[in-house]
């Protein structure tokens, strides 16, 4: 029941009472009092309208805030998803970079090992080259010394030959021998005949080497004892007289033919 009906029923006289043909009642004699119910109703209506508007605005604001919150959450979720994707990409790049660095480090170690090996080989080859250079230089010095000795010896022989040609012709005739080349510049072949009483045409020969300072007999036919040949060579190299060699070798051949 509304307040208007309640108040009407409370303060207004009933129909039965108003219908009674009585004289003025005590209530009719009371002064009229204005309680301001209309103004109160207007104020209540305005308050209700304001309250409803406030509630509606609050509801709209709550909806807007909820929608904004949902949008913010969606944006945050999207940002989180993008950040997660960025992190995955960065992690993949980091793994790739680490693998590349490890590969480069391994390649660097291999290159350093190869460089060390090549350096060691270079040092060995340099040492070997220096040793070969020294060996070549020593060999060249030895060759030069031998060539100088040979030239000196050849000059000596040439000088001696100029004086010994008549004597050599004498011994060639008397020792029944001839001189031939032995296929080398520093060798001579001496061939004897009339050393075998049973066959005067039988020949014996030896090759004389003059490549060094001392004379040396390299080959002979028939073969002679090396010790006896060395004794003859010792006398020749001591006296430097070729006739000693020619006579000594003939004696050895005659002795060999008789045995």
From Swiss-Prot:
Main subcellular localisation: nucleus
Residue ranges of the region described as Disordered: 1-25
Record's compositionally biased regions (Polar residues): 1-20
Lineage top rank: taxon: Eukaryota
Coiled coil residues, start to end: 59-162
Keywords: Cell cycle, Cell division, Centromere, Chromosome, Coiled coil, Kinetochore, Mitosis, Nucleus
Gene Ontology terms: cellular component: Ndc80 complex; nucleus
Localization of this protein: Nucleus; Chromosome, Centromere, Kinetochore
Record-level GO BP terms: cell division; chromosome segregation
PANTHER family with a match to the protein in the record: KINETOCHORE PROTEIN SPC25, KINETOCHORE PROTEIN SPC25-RELATED
Family: Belongs to the SPC25 family.
Subunit annotation: Component of the NDC80 complex, which consists of kpr-1/ndc80, kpr-2/nuf2, kpr-3/spc24 and kpr-4/spc25.
Function: Acts as a component of the essential kinetochore-associated NDC80 complex, which is required for chromosome segregation and spindle checkpoint activity.
Protein name as annotated: Probable kinetochore protein spc25
Organism for this UniProt entry: Neurospora crassa (strain ATCC 24698 / 74-OR23-1A / CBS 708.71 / DSM 1257 / FGSC 987)
Taxonomic path: Eukaryota, Fungi, Dikarya, Ascomycota, Pezizomycotina
Gene this protein is translated from: kpr-4
């Amino acid at each position: 029941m509304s307040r208007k009906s309640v108040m009407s029923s409370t303060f207004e006289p009933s129909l039965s009472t108003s219908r009674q043909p009585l004289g003025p009642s005590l209530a009719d004699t009371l002064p009229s009092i204005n309680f301001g119910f209309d103004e109160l109703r207007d104020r209540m209506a305005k308050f209700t309208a304001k309250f409803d508007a406030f509630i509606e605005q609050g509801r709209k604001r709550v909806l807007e805030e909820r929608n904004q919150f949902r949008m913010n959450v969606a944006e945050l979720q999207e940002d989180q998803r993008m950040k997660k994707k960025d992190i995955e990409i960065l992690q993949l790049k980091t793994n790739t970079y680490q693998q590349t660095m490890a590969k480069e480090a391994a390649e660097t170690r291999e290159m350093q090992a190869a460089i060390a090996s090549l350096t060691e080989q270079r040092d060995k080859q340099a040492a070997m080259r220096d040793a070969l250079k020294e060996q070549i230089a020593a060999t060249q010095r030895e060759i030069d010394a031998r060539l100088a000795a040979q030239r000196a010896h050849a000059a000596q022989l040439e000088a001696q030959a100029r004086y010994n040609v008549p004597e050599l012709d004498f011994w060639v005739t008397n020792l029944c021998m001839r001189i031939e080349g032995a296929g080398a510049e520093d060798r001579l072949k001496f061939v004897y005949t009339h050393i075998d009483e049973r066959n005067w045409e039988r020949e014996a020969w030896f090759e004389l080497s003059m490549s060094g300072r001392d004379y040396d007999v390299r080959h002979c036919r028939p073969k002679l004892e090396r010790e006896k040949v060395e004794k003859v060579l010792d006398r020749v190299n001591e006296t430097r007289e070729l006739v000693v060699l020619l006579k000594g070798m003939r004696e050895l051949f005659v002795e060999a033919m008789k045995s």
